[in-house]
Amino acid sequence: MRIQLLSDLHLETEDYTPQAAPGADLLVLAGDIDTTWSSLSLFANWPTPVVFIPGNHEFDGRDIDQALTGLRDQCRHLGIRLLEKETWITTAPDGRRIRFVGTTRWCDFDLFGNEQRPRAMRAANYFVKVMRAMRNGQIFDPDAVRAEALVCKDWLRETLRQTPQADSDAHWDTTVVITHYGPSLRSADPRYGKQPGTASFCNADDDLMPGVACWIHGHLHCRHDYTVSHEAGQTHVVSNARGHGYKHEADHYDGLRCITI
């Protein structure tokens, strides 16, 4: 299965027109496509199925629960498959069953361990102010972000523990995880390195990788393609985030990038 990867297009400000990659079987949108949601219509009637995992900026200035409901409705209308703490199993052209496991997977600020968490959460206050998101009338502050992140992680852990059911619709041969946030410190942006604010972009989810063939993410405005070795073999981690043109993050961006599962 050939999967086209796009994320962090930020079409609310960026002048960019996504194109379908020749020969792709699926398009994955790994979040931060458009804070206004209006550009999601570009992916209606796409020549392949489209899977969308919301990014943090899809919730800017909104109540996150109400926003998720609204996003679901809009994606359903456009024929886009939104995954938030959900799985989707589809059949690849070669007959294999591929399970896609999707969640925004907010940051839990545990990237550098428990002792460094307070510093990481203080650094996150800046990003929270940029988002201006709410939940139940309260600011979606670092404590609220962490609480939701832990719910996402618990769901992800339990889902990845599941075993395929032979000869049923729940059978799968390969698992692909899609999150907006990076799953490992190895996904840190090299421009900024290892600092408290990095925990607002990456999680320490390396322990969840056994059994996962590929982990797709976005959020960091740089591209990644690396392999994590573990007791069960290897996991391919990949991100094709575009970022902002005015920061030169989009220089040499390949919007037709595909990976093969």
Predicted regions and their residues:
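Active-site neighborhood of phospho(di)ester-bond hydrolases with catalytic His/Asp-centered motifs
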Residues: 5-7, 27-32, 51-56, 81-86, ...
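Active-site environment of divalent metal-dependent phosphoester hydrolases
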Residues: 10-15, 34-38, 57-67, 89-92, ...
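N-terminal active-site segment of His-dependent metallophosphoesterases
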Residues: 1-52, 59-67, 135
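Beta-strand-turn-beta hairpins that frame and shape the catalytic cleft
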Residues: 1-4, 88-102, 173-174, 227-236
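Soluble or luminal CAZymes and related metallo-dependent hydrolases
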Residues: 35, 63-67, 144-156, 197-201
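A basic- and aromatic-enriched beta-loop-alpha substructure that forms the phosphate/nucleotide-
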Residues: 51-58, 63-128
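Binuclear metal-dependent phosphoesterase catalytic core
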Residues: 73, 77-78, 94, 189, ...
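Active-site-proximal loop/helix segment associated with metal-binding centers of metalloenzymes
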Residues: 101-176, 181-192
